[in-house]
Amino acid sequence: MCGIVGVVGNRNATDILMQGLEKLEYRGYDSAGIFVANGDKLSLVKSVGRIADLRSKIGIDVAGSTGIGHTRWATHGQATVENAHPHTSASSRFVLVHNGVIENYLQMKEEYLAGHEFKGQTDTEIAVHLIGKFVEEDGLSVLEAFKNALSIIEGSYAFALIDTEDADTIYVAKNKSPLLIGLGEGYNMVCSDAMAMIRETSQFMEIHDKELVILTKDSVTVLDYDGNQLERDSYTAELDLSDIGKGTYPFYMLKEIDEQPTVMRKLISTYSDESGKMAIDPAIVKTIQEADRIYILAAGTSYNAGFASKAMIEQLTDTPVELGVASEWGYNMPLLSQKPMFILLSQSGETADSRQVLVKANQMGIPSLTVTNVPGSTLSREATYTMLLHAGPEIAVASTKAYTAQVAALAFLSKAVGEANGKKEALEFDLVHELSLVAQSIEATLSEKDLIASKVEKLLATTRNAFYIGRGNDYYVAMEASLKLKEISYIQCEGFAAGELKHGTISLIEDGTPVIGLISSSELVAAHTRGNIQEVAARGASVLTVVEEGLDREGDDIVVNKVHPYLATIGMVIPTQLIAYYASLQRGLDVDKPRNLAKAVTVE
Protein backbone atom coordinates (compact mmCIF):
# COMPACT_ATOMS: atom_id res chain seq x y z
CA MET A 1 0.00 0.00 0.00
CA CYS A 2 1.43 3.37 -1.05
CA GLY A 3 4.82 3.79 -2.63
CA ILE A 4 7.86 6.02 -2.16
CA VAL A 5 10.51 6.97 -4.71
CA GLY A 6 13.37 9.41 -4.20
CA VAL A 7 16.59 10.32 -5.97
CA VAL A 8 19.53 12.66 -5.41
CA GLY A 9 22.44 13.13 -7.81
CA ASN A 10 23.31 13.32 -11.48
CA ARG A 11 20.01 12.08 -12.87
CA ASN A 12 16.82 13.61 -14.23
CA ALA A 13 14.78 13.39 -11.06
CA THR A 14 11.42 13.98 -12.72
CA ASP A 15 11.82 11.10 -15.15
CA ILE A 16 13.08 8.73 -12.47
CA LEU A 17 10.28 9.63 -10.07
CA MET A 18 7.54 9.21 -12.66
CA GLN A 19 8.91 5.93 -13.99
CA GLY A 20 9.33 4.68 -10.45
CA LEU A 21 5.78 5.63 -9.47
CA GLU A 22 4.46 3.85 -12.54
CA LYS A 23 6.30 0.71 -11.44
CA LEU A 24 4.67 1.04 -8.01
CA GLU A 25 1.12 1.37 -9.35
CA TYR A 26 0.48 -2.30 -8.64
CA ARG A 27 0.74 -1.63 -4.90
CA GLY A 28 -2.52 0.30 -5.02
CA TYR A 29 -3.14 4.05 -4.65
CA ASP A 30 -5.74 6.78 -5.07
CA SER A 31 -3.53 9.87 -5.54
CA ALA A 32 0.08 10.72 -6.31
CA GLY A 33 2.59 13.55 -6.28
CA ILE A 34 6.21 14.55 -6.75
CA PHE A 35 8.54 17.25 -5.43
CA VAL A 36 11.60 18.23 -7.50
CA ALA A 37 14.38 20.66 -6.59
CA ASN A 38 16.69 22.36 -9.08
CA GLY A 39 18.75 24.91 -7.18
CA ASP A 40 16.34 27.59 -6.03
CA LYS A 41 13.59 26.35 -8.34
CA LEU A 42 11.20 24.09 -6.43
CA SER A 43 8.28 22.21 -7.99
CA LEU A 44 5.47 20.40 -6.16
CA VAL A 45 2.82 18.66 -8.26
CA LYS A 46 -0.01 16.50 -6.90
CA SER A 47 -3.04 14.82 -8.40
CA VAL A 48 -5.96 12.56 -7.53
CA GLY A 49 -6.37 9.50 -9.72
CA ARG A 50 -3.92 7.61 -11.89
CA ILE A 51 -0.24 8.37 -12.50
CA ALA A 52 -1.26 9.42 -16.00
CA ASP A 53 -3.30 12.23 -14.43
CA LEU A 54 -0.23 13.39 -12.51
CA ARG A 55 1.95 13.20 -15.62
CA SER A 56 -0.48 15.42 -17.52
CA LYS A 57 0.03 18.18 -14.92
CA ILE A 58 3.84 18.14 -15.10
CA GLY A 59 5.34 20.75 -17.39
CA ILE A 60 8.81 20.74 -18.96
CA ASP A 61 9.92 23.22 -16.31
CA VAL A 62 9.46 20.60 -13.57
CA ALA A 63 13.05 19.41 -13.59
CA GLY A 64 15.93 18.90 -11.22
CA SER A 65 18.44 16.45 -9.78
CA THR A 66 16.79 15.84 -6.40
CA GLY A 67 13.23 14.77 -5.73
CA ILE A 68 10.77 12.56 -3.90
CA GLY A 69 7.54 11.03 -5.16
CA HIS A 70 4.65 9.15 -3.63
CA THR A 71 1.55 7.14 -4.43
CA ARG A 72 -1.02 7.44 -1.64
CA TRP A 73 -3.57 4.99 -0.32
CA ALA A 74 -5.98 6.96 1.84
CA THR A 75 -5.93 6.06 5.54
CA HIS A 76 -6.27 9.48 7.22
CA GLY A 77 -8.36 11.86 5.15
CA GLN A 78 -10.08 11.37 1.81
CA ALA A 79 -8.42 11.08 -1.58
CA THR A 80 -7.93 14.78 -2.35
CA VAL A 81 -5.11 16.91 -3.72
CA GLU A 82 -4.70 18.47 -0.28
CA ASN A 83 -4.19 15.05 1.30
CA ALA A 84 -1.91 13.73 -1.45
CA HIS A 85 1.83 13.58 -0.74
CA PRO A 86 4.39 15.17 -0.67
CA HIS A 87 3.41 17.37 2.28
CA THR A 88 5.16 20.55 3.38
CA SER A 89 5.90 22.16 6.74
CA ALA A 90 4.25 25.39 7.88
CA SER A 91 6.85 27.52 6.06
CA SER A 92 7.12 25.04 3.14
CA ARG A 93 10.83 24.62 3.88
CA PHE A 94 10.51 20.88 4.54
CA VAL A 95 8.92 18.35 2.20
CA LEU A 96 7.95 14.86 3.35
CA VAL A 97 6.51 11.63 1.95
CA HIS A 98 5.35 8.85 4.24
CA ASN A 99 3.99 5.32 4.09
CA GLY A 100 2.37 3.82 7.16
CA VAL A 101 0.10 4.95 9.98
CA ILE A 102 1.10 7.35 12.77
CA GLU A 103 -0.94 6.22 15.74
CA ASN A 104 -0.42 9.24 17.99
CA TYR A 105 -0.80 11.99 15.40
CA LEU A 106 -3.66 13.68 17.25
CA GLN A 107 -1.64 13.85 20.47
CA MET A 108 1.30 15.28 18.51
CA LYS A 109 -0.95 17.93 17.03
CA GLU A 110 -2.39 18.94 20.39
CA GLU A 111 0.88 18.89 22.33
CA TYR A 112 3.31 20.44 19.86
CA LEU A 113 1.43 22.18 17.06
CA ALA A 114 -1.20 24.38 18.67
CA GLY A 115 -1.98 27.26 16.33
CA HIS A 116 -0.64 25.54 13.21
CA GLU A 117 -2.90 25.57 10.17
CA PHE A 118 -3.08 22.45 8.03
CA LYS A 119 -4.09 22.07 4.40
CA GLY A 120 -5.42 18.52 4.73
CA GLN A 121 -6.33 15.85 7.26
CA THR A 122 -3.36 13.48 7.07
CA ASP A 123 -1.09 12.23 9.82
CA THR A 124 1.86 12.89 7.50
CA GLU A 125 1.27 16.64 7.39
CA ILE A 126 1.44 16.74 11.18
CA ALA A 127 4.79 14.92 11.07
CA VAL A 128 6.39 17.40 8.65
CA HIS A 129 5.00 20.36 10.61
CA LEU A 130 6.60 18.86 13.72
CA ILE A 131 9.99 18.60 12.03
CA GLY A 132 9.67 22.17 10.77
CA LYS A 133 8.79 23.40 14.26
CA PHE A 134 11.83 21.75 15.81
CA VAL A 135 14.13 23.48 13.30
CA GLU A 136 12.51 26.86 12.79
CA GLU A 137 11.04 27.49 16.25
CA ASP A 138 13.26 25.41 18.55
CA GLY A 139 16.58 25.89 16.73
CA LEU A 140 17.52 22.23 16.22
CA SER A 141 19.59 21.05 13.28
CA VAL A 142 17.68 19.16 10.59
CA LEU A 143 19.15 15.83 11.66
CA GLU A 144 18.39 16.44 15.34
CA ALA A 145 14.88 17.63 14.49
CA PHE A 146 14.25 14.49 12.43
CA LYS A 147 15.58 12.27 15.23
CA ASN A 148 13.50 14.14 17.78
CA ALA A 149 10.36 13.67 15.71
CA LEU A 150 11.11 9.97 15.27
CA SER A 151 11.42 9.56 19.03
CA ILE A 152 7.91 10.97 19.44
CA ILE A 153 6.13 9.29 16.52
CA GLU A 154 4.39 5.99 17.30
CA GLY A 155 3.24 3.53 14.65
CA SER A 156 4.49 2.35 11.28
CA TYR A 157 6.32 4.59 8.86
CA ALA A 158 8.70 4.94 5.99
CA PHE A 159 9.81 8.57 5.61
CA ALA A 160 11.75 10.50 2.98
CA LEU A 161 12.44 14.14 3.87
CA ILE A 162 13.99 17.04 1.94
CA ASP A 163 15.11 20.36 3.40
CA THR A 164 14.69 22.85 0.54
CA GLU A 165 17.55 24.95 1.93
CA ASP A 166 19.87 21.97 1.42
CA ALA A 167 18.15 20.02 -1.33
CA ASP A 168 21.20 17.90 -2.10
CA THR A 169 20.33 15.61 0.82
CA ILE A 170 17.44 13.22 1.49
CA TYR A 171 16.76 12.04 5.04
CA VAL A 172 15.18 8.60 5.33
CA ALA A 173 13.82 6.51 8.22
CA LYS A 174 11.64 3.43 8.62
CA ASN A 175 9.73 1.36 11.15
CA LYS A 176 7.44 -1.54 10.20
CA SER A 177 7.12 -0.30 6.63
CA PRO A 178 9.29 -1.43 3.69
CA LEU A 179 12.00 0.85 2.31
CA LEU A 180 15.20 0.26 0.33
CA ILE A 181 18.20 2.31 -0.72
CA GLY A 182 19.25 2.09 -4.36
CA LEU A 183 22.91 2.69 -5.10
CA GLY A 184 24.35 4.35 -8.20
CA GLU A 185 27.47 6.17 -9.37
CA GLY A 186 26.97 9.86 -8.75
CA TYR A 187 23.43 9.30 -7.51
CA ASN A 188 21.53 7.39 -4.84
CA MET A 189 17.87 6.53 -4.44
CA VAL A 190 15.23 5.45 -1.98
CA CYS A 191 12.20 3.32 -2.83
CA SER A 192 9.52 1.10 -1.34
CA ASP A 193 10.22 -1.70 -3.78
CA ALA A 194 13.22 -2.63 -5.91
CA MET A 195 10.99 -2.75 -8.99
CA ALA A 196 10.65 1.02 -8.82
CA MET A 197 14.38 1.49 -9.44
CA ILE A 198 15.46 -1.57 -11.40
CA ARG A 199 15.91 0.51 -14.57
CA GLU A 200 18.47 2.65 -12.75
CA THR A 201 20.35 0.15 -10.59
CA SER A 202 20.51 -3.45 -9.48
CA GLN A 203 22.42 -2.61 -6.28
CA PHE A 204 20.36 -2.12 -3.14
CA MET A 205 20.84 -1.74 0.58
CA GLU A 206 18.37 -2.80 3.25
CA ILE A 207 17.16 -0.44 5.95
CA HIS A 208 16.13 -2.06 9.21
CA ASP A 209 13.47 -0.83 11.59
CA LYS A 210 14.37 2.27 13.59
CA GLU A 211 17.28 3.22 11.37
CA LEU A 212 17.91 6.60 9.80
CA VAL A 213 19.73 7.12 6.49
CA ILE A 214 21.28 10.28 5.08
CA LEU A 215 21.49 10.21 1.27
CA THR A 216 23.62 12.44 -0.93
CA LYS A 217 24.70 11.82 -4.50
CA ASP A 218 27.99 10.30 -3.34
CA SER A 219 27.26 8.87 0.10
CA VAL A 220 24.88 6.71 2.12
CA THR A 221 25.14 7.06 5.90
CA VAL A 222 23.16 4.64 8.06
CA LEU A 223 22.53 5.57 11.70
CA ASP A 224 20.58 4.16 14.60
CA TYR A 225 18.28 6.54 16.45
CA ASP A 226 21.04 7.28 18.95
CA GLY A 227 23.21 8.59 16.13
CA ASN A 228 25.64 5.65 15.98
CA GLN A 229 26.86 4.91 12.46
CA LEU A 230 26.13 1.40 11.19
CA GLU A 231 27.83 -0.71 8.54
CA ARG A 232 25.59 -2.24 5.89
CA ASP A 233 26.43 -4.37 2.87
CA SER A 234 24.63 -3.97 -0.43
CA TYR A 235 23.07 -6.77 -2.47
CA THR A 236 22.17 -7.37 -6.09
CA ALA A 237 18.47 -7.59 -6.92
CA GLU A 238 17.72 -10.53 -9.21
CA LEU A 239 15.16 -8.80 -11.39
CA ASP A 240 14.95 -8.66 -15.16
CA LEU A 241 13.29 -5.76 -16.93
CA SER A 242 11.44 -8.23 -19.15
CA ASP A 243 9.85 -9.74 -16.02
CA ILE A 244 8.14 -6.49 -15.08
CA GLY A 245 6.71 -5.63 -18.49
CA LYS A 246 3.42 -6.80 -19.99
CA GLY A 247 4.95 -7.63 -23.35
CA THR A 248 2.11 -8.23 -25.81
CA TYR A 249 -0.45 -8.95 -23.09
CA PRO A 250 -3.32 -6.52 -22.46
CA PHE A 251 -3.10 -7.08 -18.71
CA TYR A 252 -0.51 -8.36 -16.25
CA MET A 253 -3.03 -10.79 -14.77
CA LEU A 254 -3.40 -12.72 -18.02
CA LYS A 255 0.38 -12.79 -18.45
CA GLU A 256 0.81 -14.12 -14.93
CA ILE A 257 -1.87 -16.77 -15.41
CA ASP A 258 -0.04 -17.93 -18.53
CA GLU A 259 3.29 -18.05 -16.68
CA GLN A 260 2.14 -20.72 -14.23
CA PRO A 261 3.39 -23.78 -16.16
CA THR A 262 6.83 -22.15 -16.25
CA VAL A 263 6.62 -21.44 -12.51
CA MET A 264 5.84 -25.11 -11.79
CA ARG A 265 8.89 -26.21 -13.79
CA LYS A 266 11.06 -23.58 -12.11
CA LEU A 267 10.10 -24.96 -8.71
CA ILE A 268 10.95 -28.48 -9.87
CA SER A 269 14.43 -27.38 -10.93
CA THR A 270 14.92 -25.38 -7.71
CA TYR A 271 13.69 -27.83 -5.09
CA SER A 272 14.78 -31.16 -6.56
CA ASP A 273 18.08 -32.46 -7.92
CA GLU A 274 18.75 -34.29 -11.17
CA SER A 275 17.81 -37.63 -9.61
CA GLY A 276 14.47 -36.28 -8.41
CA LYS A 277 15.45 -36.07 -4.73
CA MET A 278 14.18 -33.15 -2.68
CA ALA A 279 16.57 -30.21 -2.33
CA ILE A 280 15.16 -28.54 0.78
CA ASP A 281 17.30 -26.96 3.50
CA PRO A 282 17.90 -29.82 6.00
CA ALA A 283 17.57 -27.36 8.90
CA ILE A 284 14.00 -26.55 7.83
CA VAL A 285 13.16 -30.24 7.54
CA LYS A 286 14.62 -31.01 10.97
CA THR A 287 12.76 -28.13 12.62
CA ILE A 288 9.43 -29.28 11.20
CA GLN A 289 10.19 -32.86 12.24
CA GLU A 290 10.62 -31.65 15.80
CA ALA A 291 7.34 -29.70 15.78
CA ASP A 292 4.16 -31.26 17.12
CA ARG A 293 1.92 -28.90 15.16
CA ILE A 294 2.29 -26.59 12.16
CA TYR A 295 0.52 -23.24 12.19
CA ILE A 296 0.07 -21.55 8.82
CA LEU A 297 -0.50 -17.79 9.12
CA ALA A 298 -1.51 -15.72 6.12
CA ALA A 299 -4.01 -13.32 4.60
CA GLY A 300 -6.15 -13.25 1.47
CA THR A 301 -5.02 -15.53 -1.34
CA SER A 302 -2.08 -16.81 0.70
CA TYR A 303 -4.52 -17.90 3.40
CA ASN A 304 -6.48 -19.82 0.79
CA ALA A 305 -3.27 -21.43 -0.45
CA GLY A 306 -2.64 -22.59 3.09
CA PHE A 307 -6.07 -24.21 3.26
CA ALA A 308 -5.53 -25.79 -0.16
CA SER A 309 -2.33 -27.38 1.18
CA LYS A 310 -3.50 -28.41 4.66
CA ALA A 311 -4.63 -31.98 3.93
CA MET A 312 -1.58 -32.64 1.76
CA ILE A 313 0.83 -31.49 4.48
CA GLU A 314 -0.89 -33.59 7.13
CA GLN A 315 -0.99 -36.72 4.99
CA LEU A 316 2.64 -36.45 3.88
CA THR A 317 4.19 -35.41 7.21
CA ASP A 318 1.86 -36.87 9.86
CA THR A 319 1.90 -33.45 11.54
CA PRO A 320 -1.37 -31.64 12.37
CA VAL A 321 -1.85 -28.30 10.61
CA GLU A 322 -3.88 -25.31 11.79
CA LEU A 323 -4.68 -22.22 9.72
CA GLY A 324 -4.80 -18.75 11.20
CA VAL A 325 -5.89 -15.37 9.83
CA ALA A 326 -2.81 -13.26 10.52
CA SER A 327 -4.76 -10.09 11.30
CA GLU A 328 -6.63 -11.92 14.07
CA TRP A 329 -3.66 -13.79 15.52
CA GLY A 330 -1.73 -10.56 15.94
CA TYR A 331 -4.18 -9.52 18.64
CA ASN A 332 -5.62 -12.81 19.86
CA MET A 333 -3.17 -15.68 19.56
CA PRO A 334 -4.85 -18.95 20.64
CA LEU A 335 -3.45 -21.60 22.95
CA LEU A 336 -0.55 -23.24 21.13
CA SER A 337 0.85 -26.75 21.22
CA GLN A 338 4.03 -27.63 23.13
CA LYS A 339 6.33 -27.50 20.06
CA PRO A 340 4.74 -25.22 17.47
CA MET A 341 6.18 -24.31 14.08
CA PHE A 342 4.91 -21.20 12.28
CA ILE A 343 4.77 -21.02 8.48
CA LEU A 344 3.99 -17.56 7.11
CA LEU A 345 2.73 -17.34 3.55
CA SER A 346 3.09 -13.95 1.86
CA GLN A 347 3.65 -13.15 -1.81
CA SER A 348 5.30 -9.81 -1.02
CA GLY A 349 6.95 -10.76 2.26
CA GLU A 350 5.78 -7.39 3.59
CA THR A 351 2.27 -8.15 4.86
CA ALA A 352 1.96 -6.11 8.05
CA ASP A 353 -0.49 -8.46 9.77
CA SER A 354 1.78 -11.45 9.20
CA ARG A 355 4.76 -9.50 10.44
CA GLN A 356 2.93 -8.68 13.65
CA VAL A 357 2.49 -12.43 14.25
CA LEU A 358 6.13 -13.08 13.37
CA VAL A 359 7.34 -10.50 15.88
CA LYS A 360 5.37 -12.29 18.60
CA ALA A 361 6.64 -15.68 17.45
CA ASN A 362 10.23 -14.45 17.68
CA GLN A 363 9.60 -13.07 21.16
CA MET A 364 8.20 -16.47 22.21
CA GLY A 365 11.11 -18.38 20.66
CA ILE A 366 8.87 -20.16 18.14
CA PRO A 367 10.70 -21.28 14.96
CA SER A 368 9.27 -19.83 11.76
CA LEU A 369 9.43 -20.26 8.01
CA THR A 370 8.47 -17.55 5.54
CA VAL A 371 7.31 -18.76 2.12
CA THR A 372 7.52 -15.70 -0.11
CA ASN A 373 8.15 -14.51 -3.64
CA VAL A 374 10.44 -11.64 -2.67
CA PRO A 375 14.00 -12.27 -1.44
CA GLY A 376 15.20 -9.78 1.14
CA SER A 377 11.66 -8.85 2.17
CA THR A 378 10.88 -8.07 5.79
CA LEU A 379 9.32 -11.45 6.57
CA SER A 380 12.18 -13.31 4.91
CA ARG A 381 14.74 -11.35 6.95
CA GLU A 382 13.00 -11.79 10.28
CA ALA A 383 11.85 -15.42 10.07
CA THR A 384 14.07 -18.30 11.16
CA TYR A 385 14.01 -19.73 7.64
CA THR A 386 12.89 -18.64 4.17
CA MET A 387 11.63 -20.61 1.18
CA LEU A 388 11.35 -18.64 -2.06
CA LEU A 389 8.63 -19.15 -4.67
CA HIS A 390 10.75 -18.16 -7.70
CA ALA A 391 7.58 -17.10 -9.50
CA GLY A 392 8.95 -13.82 -10.84
CA PRO A 393 7.38 -10.43 -10.09
CA GLU A 394 3.61 -10.53 -9.69
CA ILE A 395 2.26 -7.13 -10.72
CA ALA A 396 -1.51 -7.62 -10.98
CA VAL A 397 -3.25 -6.93 -7.69
CA ALA A 398 -5.17 -10.21 -7.91
CA SER A 399 -2.70 -12.98 -7.12
CA THR A 400 -2.58 -16.01 -9.41
CA LYS A 401 0.86 -17.54 -9.90
CA ALA A 402 1.88 -16.88 -6.29
CA TYR A 403 -1.06 -19.02 -5.12
CA THR A 404 -0.13 -22.01 -7.25
CA ALA A 405 3.56 -21.55 -6.41
CA GLN A 406 2.76 -21.55 -2.69
CA VAL A 407 0.85 -24.84 -2.95
CA ALA A 408 3.65 -26.39 -5.03
CA ALA A 409 6.38 -25.14 -2.68
CA LEU A 410 4.53 -26.58 0.31
CA ALA A 411 4.31 -29.88 -1.56
CA PHE A 412 8.12 -29.99 -1.87
CA LEU A 413 8.48 -29.11 1.78
CA SER A 414 5.94 -31.75 2.86
CA LYS A 415 7.50 -34.50 0.80
CA ALA A 416 10.97 -33.71 2.18
CA VAL A 417 9.70 -33.86 5.76
CA GLY A 418 7.64 -36.98 5.08
CA GLU A 419 10.62 -38.77 3.56
CA ALA A 420 12.74 -37.83 6.55
CA ASN A 421 10.02 -39.31 8.76
CA GLY A 422 9.95 -42.49 6.67
CA LYS A 423 6.31 -41.87 5.77
CA LYS A 424 5.15 -44.32 3.10
CA GLU A 425 2.90 -41.79 1.36
CA ALA A 426 5.79 -39.34 0.98
CA LEU A 427 8.25 -41.97 -0.22
CA GLU A 428 5.83 -43.18 -2.90
CA PHE A 429 4.76 -39.70 -4.03
CA ASP A 430 6.73 -38.87 -7.20
CA LEU A 431 6.36 -35.12 -6.86
CA VAL A 432 8.67 -34.18 -9.72
CA HIS A 433 6.70 -36.31 -12.17
CA GLU A 434 3.32 -35.30 -10.79
CA LEU A 435 4.10 -31.59 -10.81
CA SER A 436 5.28 -31.93 -14.41
CA LEU A 437 1.83 -33.31 -15.19
CA VAL A 438 0.30 -30.34 -13.37
CA ALA A 439 2.23 -27.99 -15.66
CA GLN A 440 0.80 -29.86 -18.65
CA SER A 441 -2.69 -29.71 -17.15
CA ILE A 442 -2.40 -25.95 -16.73
CA GLU A 443 -1.32 -25.60 -20.36
CA ALA A 444 -4.33 -27.65 -21.47
CA THR A 445 -6.69 -25.41 -19.50
CA LEU A 446 -5.05 -22.28 -20.87
CA SER A 447 -5.72 -23.54 -24.40
CA GLU A 448 -9.46 -23.35 -23.60
CA LYS A 449 -9.58 -19.60 -23.01
CA ASP A 450 -12.18 -18.96 -25.72
CA LEU A 451 -14.49 -21.62 -24.29
CA ILE A 452 -14.17 -20.22 -20.78
CA ALA A 453 -14.73 -16.65 -21.99
CA SER A 454 -17.96 -17.68 -23.72
CA LYS A 455 -19.22 -19.48 -20.60
CA VAL A 456 -18.47 -16.42 -18.48
CA GLU A 457 -20.27 -14.07 -20.85
CA LYS A 458 -23.46 -16.10 -20.56
CA LEU A 459 -23.25 -16.56 -16.80
CA LEU A 460 -21.61 -13.52 -15.21
CA ALA A 461 -21.75 -10.53 -17.55
CA THR A 462 -24.57 -8.75 -15.71
CA THR A 463 -25.03 -10.55 -12.40
CA ARG A 464 -24.49 -8.93 -9.01
CA ASN A 465 -24.13 -12.16 -7.02
CA ALA A 466 -22.58 -15.59 -7.54
CA PHE A 467 -21.54 -18.67 -5.58
CA TYR A 468 -18.82 -21.30 -5.80
CA ILE A 469 -19.45 -24.66 -4.15
CA GLY A 470 -17.29 -27.73 -3.60
CA ARG A 471 -16.37 -30.42 -1.09
CA GLY A 472 -13.02 -31.27 0.46
CA ASN A 473 -10.20 -29.60 -1.43
CA ASP A 474 -12.73 -28.23 -3.90
CA TYR A 475 -14.19 -26.19 -1.05
CA TYR A 476 -10.76 -24.62 -0.47
CA VAL A 477 -10.47 -23.88 -4.18
CA ALA A 478 -13.98 -22.38 -4.03
CA MET A 479 -12.78 -19.96 -1.34
CA GLU A 480 -9.94 -18.74 -3.55
CA ALA A 481 -12.11 -18.70 -6.68
CA SER A 482 -14.74 -16.55 -4.98
CA LEU A 483 -12.10 -14.14 -3.69
CA LYS A 484 -10.65 -13.77 -7.17
CA LEU A 485 -14.05 -13.10 -8.73
CA LYS A 486 -15.10 -10.50 -6.17
CA GLU A 487 -11.69 -8.78 -6.24
CA ILE A 488 -11.66 -7.86 -9.91
CA SER A 489 -15.26 -8.12 -11.17
CA TYR A 490 -16.94 -6.60 -8.08
CA ILE A 491 -19.47 -9.45 -8.11
CA GLN A 492 -20.54 -10.36 -4.58
CA CYS A 493 -19.31 -13.94 -4.59
CA GLU A 494 -18.92 -16.48 -1.80
CA GLY A 495 -17.32 -19.90 -1.71
CA PHE A 496 -19.20 -22.50 0.31
CA ALA A 497 -18.79 -26.09 1.37
CA ALA A 498 -21.43 -27.75 -0.82
CA GLY A 499 -22.79 -29.76 2.09
CA GLU A 500 -23.53 -26.54 3.99
CA LEU A 501 -25.97 -25.21 1.40
CA LYS A 502 -28.95 -26.76 3.17
CA HIS A 503 -27.91 -25.10 6.44
CA GLY A 504 -28.80 -21.60 5.33
CA THR A 505 -27.12 -20.51 2.11
CA ILE A 506 -29.64 -22.13 -0.21
CA SER A 507 -32.14 -19.46 0.85
CA LEU A 508 -30.16 -17.02 -1.29
CA ILE A 509 -30.70 -19.00 -4.49
CA GLU A 510 -33.26 -17.55 -6.87
CA ASP A 511 -33.94 -17.58 -10.59
CA GLY A 512 -30.73 -16.91 -12.50
CA THR A 513 -28.34 -16.95 -9.53
CA PRO A 514 -24.97 -18.13 -10.90
CA VAL A 515 -23.57 -21.16 -9.07
CA ILE A 516 -20.23 -22.65 -10.12
CA GLY A 517 -19.71 -26.20 -8.93
CA LEU A 518 -16.20 -27.65 -8.54
CA ILE A 519 -15.84 -31.43 -8.79
CA SER A 520 -12.63 -33.41 -8.30
CA SER A 521 -11.49 -36.06 -5.78
CA SER A 522 -13.45 -39.34 -5.61
CA GLU A 523 -16.60 -40.70 -7.24
CA LEU A 524 -18.38 -40.52 -3.89
CA VAL A 525 -17.51 -36.87 -3.29
CA ALA A 526 -18.37 -36.05 -6.90
CA ALA A 527 -21.78 -37.70 -6.54
CA HIS A 528 -22.58 -35.69 -3.43
CA THR A 529 -21.50 -32.41 -5.04
CA ARG A 530 -23.60 -33.18 -8.11
CA GLY A 531 -26.54 -33.71 -5.78
CA ASN A 532 -26.00 -30.23 -4.36
CA ILE A 533 -25.79 -28.82 -7.88
CA GLN A 534 -29.14 -30.40 -8.68
CA GLU A 535 -30.60 -28.82 -5.54
CA VAL A 536 -29.65 -25.29 -6.59
CA ALA A 537 -30.64 -25.91 -10.21
CA ALA A 538 -34.08 -27.00 -9.03
CA ARG A 539 -34.43 -23.61 -7.35
CA GLY A 540 -33.60 -21.66 -10.49
CA ALA A 541 -29.82 -21.28 -10.30
CA SER A 542 -27.77 -20.95 -13.48
CA VAL A 543 -25.10 -23.60 -13.05
CA LEU A 544 -21.58 -23.95 -14.46
CA THR A 545 -19.51 -27.05 -13.66
CA VAL A 546 -15.73 -27.35 -13.51
CA VAL A 547 -14.89 -31.06 -13.38
CA GLU A 548 -11.72 -33.11 -13.23
CA GLU A 549 -11.20 -35.57 -16.05
CA GLY A 550 -12.58 -39.01 -15.23
CA LEU A 551 -15.42 -37.58 -13.19
CA ASP A 552 -16.94 -35.63 -16.07
CA ARG A 553 -20.34 -36.27 -17.60
CA GLU A 554 -22.08 -35.09 -20.70
CA GLY A 555 -23.14 -31.50 -20.25
CA ASP A 556 -20.29 -30.45 -17.97
CA ASP A 557 -18.89 -27.06 -18.93
CA ILE A 558 -15.14 -27.14 -18.24
CA VAL A 559 -13.07 -30.32 -17.89
CA VAL A 560 -9.64 -30.17 -16.24
CA ASN A 561 -6.92 -32.77 -16.80
CA LYS A 562 -6.64 -35.24 -13.94
CA VAL A 563 -3.63 -34.75 -11.66
CA HIS A 564 -2.49 -36.28 -8.39
CA PRO A 565 -5.03 -35.61 -5.59
CA TYR A 566 -2.37 -33.80 -3.53
CA LEU A 567 -2.01 -31.27 -6.34
CA ALA A 568 -5.60 -31.04 -7.55
CA THR A 569 -6.02 -27.66 -5.87
CA ILE A 570 -3.56 -26.28 -8.42
CA GLY A 571 -5.22 -27.79 -11.48
CA MET A 572 -8.74 -26.87 -10.38
CA VAL A 573 -7.96 -23.24 -9.59
CA ILE A 574 -6.73 -22.33 -13.10
CA PRO A 575 -10.16 -22.16 -14.80
CA THR A 576 -11.47 -20.08 -11.89
CA GLN A 577 -8.67 -17.56 -12.44
CA LEU A 578 -9.73 -17.26 -16.07
CA ILE A 579 -13.39 -17.00 -15.06
CA ALA A 580 -12.52 -14.02 -12.86
CA TYR A 581 -10.36 -12.46 -15.57
CA TYR A 582 -13.03 -12.65 -18.27
CA ALA A 583 -15.80 -11.51 -15.92
CA SER A 584 -13.80 -8.36 -15.17
CA LEU A 585 -12.81 -7.85 -18.80
CA GLN A 586 -16.37 -8.22 -20.08
CA ARG A 587 -17.58 -5.69 -17.53
CA GLY A 588 -15.09 -3.14 -18.82
CA LEU A 589 -13.09 -2.98 -15.59
CA ASP A 590 -9.38 -2.49 -14.93
CA VAL A 591 -8.31 -6.09 -14.41
CA ASP A 592 -4.90 -5.27 -12.94
CA LYS A 593 -5.94 -2.43 -10.63
CA PRO A 594 -9.30 -3.14 -8.98
CA ARG A 595 -10.76 -0.35 -6.90
CA ASN A 596 -9.84 0.03 -3.24
CA LEU A 597 -7.28 -2.81 -3.31
CA ALA A 598 -3.53 -2.83 -2.79
CA LYS A 599 -1.05 -5.50 -3.83
CA ALA A 600 1.06 -5.31 -0.70
CA VAL A 601 -0.87 -4.56 2.51
CA THR A 602 1.82 -2.89 4.59
CA VAL A 603 -0.36 -1.37 7.31
CA GLU A 604 -2.30 -3.28 9.95
From Swiss-Prot:
Every SIS domain range: 284-423, 456-594
| GO cellular component terms given for this protein | cytosol
**UniProt domain Glutamine amidotransferase type-2: residue ranges:** 2-218
Q: Plastid as a keyword? A: no
Q: What is its EC number?
A: 2.6.1.16
Q: What is its main location?
A: cytoplasm
Q: Where is the active site?
A: 2, 599
Q: Which domain of life is it from?
A: Bacteria
Catalytic activities: D-fructose 6-phosphate + L-glutamine = D-glucosamine 6-phosphate + L-glutamate
The keyword Ubl conjugation is assigned to this record: no
Which Pfam families does UniProt cross-reference here? Answer: GATase_6, SIS
A GO BP entry is:
carbohydrate metabolic process
One GO molecular function term of this record is: carbohydrate derivative binding
Keyword vocabulary terms for this entry: Aminotransferase, Cytoplasm, Glutamine amidotransferase, Repeat, Transferase
Q: Which InterPro entries match?
A: GATase_2_dom, GFAT, GFAT_N, GlmS/AgaS_SIS, GlmS/FrlB_SIS, Ntn_hydrolases_N, SIS_dom, SIS_dom_sf
Localization of this protein = Cytoplasm
What is the annotated role of this protein in its UniProt record?
A: Catalyzes the first step in hexosamine metabolism, converting fructose-6P into glucosamine-6P using glutamine as a nitrogen source.
Subunit info here reads: Homodimer.
The record's annotation in PANTHER family points to: GLUCOSAMINE--FRUCTOSE-6-PHOSPHATE AMINOTRANSFERASE, ISOMERIZING (PTHR10937), GLUTAMINE--FRUCTOSE-6-PHOSPHATE TRANSAMINASE (ISOMERIZING) (PTHR10937:SF0)
What is the protein name stated in its UniProt record? Glutamine--fructose-6-phosphate aminotransferase [isomerizing]
